[in-house]
């Protein structure tokens, strides 16, 4: 069974397997009973839990780091590139439930799908087992990278721009293609384009965050690994 297979990989057994199913369900799957039965809500929660746990982890690992250095390290550990890297390491794509159309278009290997499903999985673990369970999962897959961070890494946009310059390409361009939600909680969709590479989209609660996430996805697309 899928539940048993993924539980062995993530070292966590769900008490409520419905939460796991929801975390692994892509929005392309339409439910007759609940149109919201997909990973989007859990992704929202998981993103917040991941940021909290990684922040505390870095705070304890690096007691003498400045706020600025801690922030840079956290950015590298929660960026799209790192999420995709971890999702691929546990073969998360093969467990994502999606429509035949989405799968035939490479949905199981799509960076955005992997990133979203991993955050949703964290959210599901948090709801099922509490903060302790979520921390155990995050420590299992993130602590090694956090511990071996020697120099504060650059943000994804800076890394992408330097990569483009090293290839003789023009600087990446970012454009807001959609803004939705209420004024107090907006959601921006940003498109990034670089040379001949396809455009990629990412969303965030502000323009800066959406651009960083788009840059992270592009780095994952070109197989650039943040050390």
UniProtKB/Swiss-Prot annotation:
Domain DRBM: residue ranges: 155-224
Requisite cofactors: Mg(2+)
Subunit structure: Homodimer.
Highest taxon, organism lineage: Bacteria
Catalytic activity: Endonucleolytic cleavage to 5'-phosphomonoester
Keyword flag Hydrolase: yes
Family annotation (InterPro entries): dsRBD_dom, RNase_III, RNase_III_dom, RNase_III_sf
Gene Ontology cellular-component terms listed: cytoplasm
PANTHER family noted in UniProt: RIBONUCLEASE 3, RIBONUCLEASE III
Main localization (coarse): cytoplasm
Keyword Manganese: no
Ranges of residues in domain RNase III: 3-130
Gene Ontology BP term (one): mRNA processing
Protein name as catalogued: Ribonuclease 3
Annotated catalytic residues: 47, 119
Organism: Ehrlichia ruminantium (strain Gardel)
Protein residues bound to Mg(2+): 43, 116, 119
Family that this chain belongs to: Belongs to the ribonuclease III family.
EC number of the protein: 3.1.26.3
Gene: rnc
GO molecular function: double-stranded RNA binding; metal ion binding; ribonuclease III activity; rRNA binding
Swiss-Prot/TrEMBL keywords: Cytoplasm, Endonuclease, Hydrolase, Magnesium, Metal-binding, mRNA processing, Nuclease, RNA-binding, rRNA processing, rRNA-binding, tRNA processing
Ranges annotated as spanning the membrane: none
Function: Digests double-stranded RNA. Involved in the processing of primary rRNA transcript to yield the immediate precursors to the large and small rRNAs (23S and 16S). Processes some mRNAs, and tRNAs when they are encoded in the rRNA operon. Processes pre-crRNA and tracrRNA of type II CRISPR loci if present in the organism.
Compartments where found: Cytoplasm
Pfam families linked to this entry: dsrm (PF00035), Ribonucleas_3_3 (PF14622)
């Amino acid at each position: 069974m899928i539940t048993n297979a993924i539980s062995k990989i993530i070292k966590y057994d769900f008490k409520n397997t419905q939460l796991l199913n929801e975390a692994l369900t892509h929005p392309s799957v339409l439910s007759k009973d609940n149109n919201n039965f997909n990973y989007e809500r859990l992704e929202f929660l998981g993103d917040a839990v991941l940021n909290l746990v990684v922040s505390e982890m870095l705070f304890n690992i690096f007691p003498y780091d400045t706020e600025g250095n801690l922030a840079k390290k956290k950015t590298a550990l929660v960026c799209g590139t790192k999420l995709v890297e971890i999702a691929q390491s546990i073969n998360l794509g093969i467990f994502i439930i999606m429509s035949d159309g989405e799968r035939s278009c490479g949905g199981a290997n799509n960076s955005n799908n992997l990133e979203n499903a991993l955050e949703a999985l964290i959210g599901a673990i948090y709801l099922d087992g509490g903060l302790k369970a979520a921390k155990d999962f995050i420590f299992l897959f993130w602590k090694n990278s956090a511990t071996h961070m020697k120099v504060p890494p650059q943000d994804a946009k800076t890394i992408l721009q330097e990569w483009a310059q090293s290839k003789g390409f023009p600087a990446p361009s970012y454009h807001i293609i959609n803004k939705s939600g209420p004024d107090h909680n907006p959601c921006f969709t940003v498109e990034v384009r670089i040379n001949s590479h396809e455009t990629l989209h990412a969303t965030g609660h502000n323009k800066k965050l959406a651009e960083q996430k788009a840059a992270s996805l592009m780095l994952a697309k070109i197989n650039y690994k943040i050390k």
